[in-house]
Amino acid sequence: MSVPNSPEAPWAVGQLNDQVKNWIQRLGFIWVEGQVTQVNMKSTWRFSYITLRDVNLEASVSLTVETSALKNLATPVKDGDRIVVHGKPSFYSKRGSFSLWVTEIRQVGIGQLLAQIEQLKKAMFAEGLFDPRLKTPLPFLPTTVGLITGRGSAAERDVMEVAKRRWPAVRFRVINTAVQGPKTVPQVVDALQELERDSAVDVIIVARGGGSVEDLLPFSEETLVREVSRLRTPVVSAIGHEPDNPLLDYVADVRAATPTDAAKTVVPDVVQELRIISEARQRGAGALRNWVAHERKGLAQIRTRPVMADPSLPVARQQDIIAEALQRKDRALGVHVRSLRSSIESLKAQVNALGPSQTLARGYSIVQVIPRDKSGAQVVTTVDQVTPGSQLRIRVPDGSITAAAMGVQAAPGGVMNKNSNTTDSTDNTENGTGEA
C-alpha cells in the first residue's frame, strides 16, 4: 500500500529506505555480466565483496557472495575477469546501500569473449567506423608526439629511444595508464581526451608490448574504440599482438606491429632525410650545371654568326630594304600621278570638245530669251519660249548681241504657238538668230 507523501507529511529516511527496499525486492533473481575490478576476500570472512563494472559504460555494482562459493570456483576470480553472476538485488535500509546477493558465478571463457569481439567488429564494420576513407594521414614531421603506455614499460622506452635516435628534436607528452585489467579502458579514454585537447600534440601513439589475448581485451572494448573514432588527432595503434588484432588496430589511423615500428612510422629518420636532401641538392646542382653548359653553348653559337661580327650589318641591311621600298613607293606614286594627269587631260579635252565655247568656235551661236521681269536669261530650245517682240541675247565667240524677235516660225511638221506671228517669221529668223 502506498504511503502518503507531501510537504506536510514527508517521509522519514527509514521510510524512504523501506520503500526503496520494497521496490528492489520485486526484481527477483537476475543474471548480470561484467568485469571484475576489485575482490575483497578473506578466508575468515563469511561473505566476500566484489565490484563488477560495465565493460562499455562508467557503471558498477557491488556484489555480495559467500566466501565458500568463491573458494569452490575452479579458477579464482581476479581483477579483469569477465564473469556472469546470478543473484537477487538487495538494499540495506539501515545504511542505504545497494548490493547484489550472488548465488552463482560463471566465468566467461576466452572463446566466448573472442566471439563477442568478432560480433562487435562486424557491427562496427557495417557502421563504417573502420572505413579507410576516414583515416587521417600522419604529419610528416610532428613537433610533439602524445604517448599513452604503461609506466616504466618497455614499450615507452622503445618508442622514445627510437624516436629520439631518428629525430633528436622531437618532443613527447607521455601519459601513463593501465594497459591491462579493468582500469585500462577508463584511463586510456581519459588520456586520449586530454591529448586531443592539447593543440601542440600532432599525433598520438597507444603502445603496449604485446601480451596474451586476455591481457589485450581492453583494447577491443567498444567504449575505447568509439572514442578513438571521434578523435581528430591521428592515432597510431602499437599493441603488438599477432595474429589476433584488437579492434583498436582497425579504428586507428595507422597500425604498427610493435612500439618500435610505431616510432619509425611517426618520426622520420634525420640521417635518411638529410641524405635525401643531399641527393636532391646534388641532382639540382647537376641539372643547373647542365643548363648553364647548354646555354653557354647556345650563346657561343650565336656569337659565331656574321651579325655578331658586325652588329651594324643588320641595321644597314634594314636601311637598304627601307630605301628600296621608298624608291618603289616613289615610282609607283609617280606612275599613278601621271596616269591620273593623263586621265584628267583626256576628260578636259572631252569637256572642251563638247562645251559651248567649242560649239561657238565652229560658227554656232547661243540664243537666250530675256524675260520681261529681267529674271535670269534662259537658253532658247523651242519656239514656244519666244513670241514676237521678245528680247533676245545672241552669244557668239567674241561677244553677245541683243536683239528683238520679229516673228516665230516652227519647223516643218512642228506645232505653231498660237501667239506667234507667221508673217515675218522667215526674215526675222534669218536676220536675228543665225545658226542655232
UniProtKB/Swiss-Prot annotation:
Tell me, what is an example of a GO biological process annotation in this record? DNA catabolic process
Q: Which InterPro entries match?
A: Exonuc_VII_L, Exonuc_VII_lsu_C, OB-fold_nuc-bd_dom
Function per UniProt: Bidirectionally degrades single-stranded DNA into large acid-insoluble oligonucleotides, which are then degraded further into small acid-soluble oligonucleotides.
Protein name (Swiss-Prot/TrEMBL): Exodeoxyribonuclease 7 large subunit
Instruction: Kindly list the places in or outside the cell where this protein is found, as annotated in its UniProt entry.
Output: Cytoplasm
Q: How does it assemble?
A: Heterooligomer composed of large and small subunits.
What EC identifiers does the entry list?
3.1.11.6
Name of the gene encoding the protein in the UniProt record: xseA
Skewed-composition ranges (Low complexity): 417-436
- Listed HAMAP family: Exonuc_7_L
Q: Which PANTHER family match?
A: EXODEOXYRIBONUCLEASE 7 LARGE SUBUNIT (PTHR30008:SF0)
NCBIfam families, from UniProt? Answer: xseA
